[in-house]
Amino acid sequence: MDQQQQGLDRNTLVGIVLISVIMGVWMIFFAPEPPTPEQRQAIADSLAALQPDSLDQGEPFLVDPAVEGTLAAPTDSAFAAATQGTAETVVVETETYIATLSTKGGTMLNFVLKEYNKAGEEATPVDLVSNTDDGALAVVFTPPSGRIVDSRSLFFQTTASTQDTIRVTDGPQQIAFDAPIGGGALRLAYTFEPEGHGVGFAVEEVNSNLLTRAGGYELLWDGGLPFDELDANDESINAGAYVRAGGEVEQIKLSKEPELNELITGTIEWTAVKNKYFVAAILPGEGLATEGAELDGLRIGEPGEAAFDDYYTTRLLIPRAATGEPNPYTLYLGPVDLSFLDDYDESLYEVVDYGFGAFMTRPLAKYVIAPVFRLFGTFIPSYGVVIILFAILIKILLYPLTKSAYRSTAKMRDLQPEMTALKEKYPDDPQKQQEQMMKLYRDRGVNPLGGCLPLLLQYPIIIALWRFFQNSILIRQESFLWANDLSAPDPVLHLPF
């Protein structure tokens, strides 16, 4: 019995060593390369040029490069007509959301998802734009006067109703905001569809060339997304800012550092900010030139504090704006749900972190686990039952691998007496021992690695399942038996500290 146990311990040790070696080799050869000194200096130079030293809460981002950290209204005569006005709101309602726009800045003040509620507040719907008082969306540029201008500091005009809610039911509806500048106008236009989570957005100069003379502009999403779950620390771990360029996704996460900046150059496919279950993404229109993007992050407070939050900003760098030609974008503002994300860009699901083995686990989750799980959910009313059935299905599918591992372990256990005899026969000749053991394996048809390889093959599937259920909005706020929320931990005892 002791010899059998020693054999089992040896097989277990071999399996652990092999798995550790594979993971170590993967991390060494496939880990992302650190930025070069030249790249770090380029990022620092860009941030020094684009960021103010400080921001006054409640004021728009409008910086005088000569006196960093100060905020003031544009003094250039080209903006005189846009510096005065009254802030009014335009409310737009579709089947899936209610958006509130403002004539102050032509920006978005609220974007309420009608089908989703905040955790612990069933009557309070999720609002993706509540982390900033000035609105999330902004156009920032530097006119010939040299003063950086944020569109949220300007007053816009609109022909849309500011009295009644605009309900979009039959077809797309466009709402345009015009700020009088330079003898013409800066136009920010939104296009709303009756269904879906997408919003069309366009930046256009009308009879003006200030953006062109400024050398382009930045399109900002400011403030990230507010935390909507009970566990703010867990949500911080899953939140971040993202950009996809050259087929690769770059990200920053404040769960690792309290303040982060990253500059990415080249053609940008999309930028995004995310909390655990929701995402706000900006996708440039086809043919629109981009020259890079910047991701900024700042942590406020510490986990456990009431004021704890993570603020992310994405800046899409547009090199020029042709007068009379709108620069088109698509905004995706909704859940991290494959069935919605794929309608806008299949790569948007890459905002979900699947770890260093994502090249294996993400495709498994996206093309196998998610479709099957959603299929079960279409005819089974309880997601708790779906999870149980899904677990049984996975167990059945993995049974051949598990059986193979058990069978190989049993064969190795049966060989233990003969292997012990070989060691006793050649106690001082390890090479002879190894030769005779390999001959014994061949004669008996035993693979010494047969016990750990089947288990190793299951590893990507198990990790994909774990990551999928950890981030799936399908089970968010779904109850089963005594559990009120299948996506949240089930507390057994609340400790007084």
Model-assigned labels for residue ranges:
Residues 1-56, 101, 201-204, 219-238, ...:
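Helix-loop-helix
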Residues 46, 54, 77, 164-165, ...:
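Coil residues (strongly favoring Ser/Thr
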Residues 46-49, 54, 61, 70, ...:
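Acidic/proline-rich low-complexity IDRs
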Residues 54-89:
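Short, Gly/Pro- and small/polar-rich lid/capping loops
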Residues 82-84, 89-352:
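Soluble non-transmembrane domains of integral membrane proteins
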